Amino acid sequence: MIYAVFFEERAAKELARIDKPYQLLIKKKIEQLTENFDSMVNNLKPLKGKYDYYRLRVGSYRVIFHKDSRKIIISIVRIGHRKSIYKDFD
């Protein structure tokens, strides 16, 4: 099942601030995620206290997203370094 991807405005800005090599790697991982969600389970972890929110690990960076299985949509909520990504995520 192929998911559609939607970047929230904040996530798009955060991605633009990351160095180009990591941007390309993050985009590649997101593409793999949309094409075959089940094959990425080793890099995914559900967020505690947040239903249908997950984090995707890409090196030192994390991609936080919401998966809507009914509409087959993945909404990218936040992208950032692992040290700071969770600080103001609510």
Locations of the language-model features?
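A short, surface-exposed loop/turn module that caps and links secondary-structure elements
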Residues: E31-L56
